[in-house]
Amino acid sequence: GCSTLKNIILPSSLQKIGVRSFNGCSSLINVELGHINSIGDVAFNGCTALTSITFPNNLTSIGNYAFSGCTELSSITFEEEKLNQSTLELSSMTIGNYAFEGCTKINTLTIPDKVTTLGNYAFNKCEALTSVSFGNGLVSIGNYAFGDCKKLTTVTFGTSLETIGERAFSNTQLPSLTLPSTTKIIGDWAFYGCPLNSIEFNNGLQTIGSRAFYGVSVESLNIPNSVTSLGSYAFSNCKNLSSVVLGTGITKIEDYTFNSCSSLSNIECPSVTEIGASAFASCSILKDIPLNENITTLGNGAFKSCKAITSVTVPNSVTDMGTSIFDGCTELLSATLGTGVFSVPNYTFNNCSKLATIVLSENITSIGQYAFQNCTSLAALPLTANITQINNYAFKG
């Protein structure tokens, strides 16, 4: 870079700034962009003295890494665009991948209506950023776009947003979330590690990705009927979550979805047919578990270490049971297995030390390894005539 260059005034006739044009101009303080409509990749990357930039109203593209690493850049201004009188529309604009990554002094940000796409990592690690207001034209927020913006507390979404990318707001400080009715997809890890205590989903939402809200502080959830995909670990480790209502679009609770939600006491899931591995494991105060006549599949450890459960009836509709489903349910007193299962899988009631009553159907033919290990309160087991196999350590302890 031209390390001594301090001021740039571009002529109004110039339309495009090319790739790496001013890359590494470490003394550059002032830039007047004239009527530029395109800024190329890495154009001002590493201009560490640049403190402010004003983008002209005809700008349509800010390239990848264009201002990445401009560590003194604290002010970004977009000139207001006038409506095109022939089309009555604003021109569109994109902000590229990593465009402002690591601009550690940007405090507030207002994205104009003309911006339709924010690239991956666009404002990642902008550590001073506290507030973002998105324009009504924005459709997509890229992966990691605001990830690790550790002071970000306020976000206002526009009316056109459809997609929030992976880790888009992970490890920010957002206390609440209200999504517009247009939002369809929340990507994996999107709000991972945020202190969200309030989440309002819209009825157009379709997908909530894996770990999207892992560890947030929300106390209740109402998932709309439009949601058909709820990813693994989506709300895992949400320690304050006490009540969940799943809409009719959810037919499967994926692996670990509500794992370690230690305050969860109420769950409604009227259309669910499958409960994945460890989906509710370590939900330590969950007493009434969602086993209705729609359920066909219970994954490994689905209710493992749910220590408040006292009674359980596995309905006749269940035909597929994994291992360790009630392992460590130390308050479980009685259990009934329906007619749809033909074996008691390995570790099913392992360490259920208070289990005193068990009812098995005539269809049970085998009892798995460690199935009743350490069931020290179990005085009698009604073994039916159809049982042909009892595996190793089935009643150990």
Describe these PLM feature segments:
Residues 2-16, 26-38, 48-61, 71-94, ...:
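Structural signature of tandem-repeat unit edges
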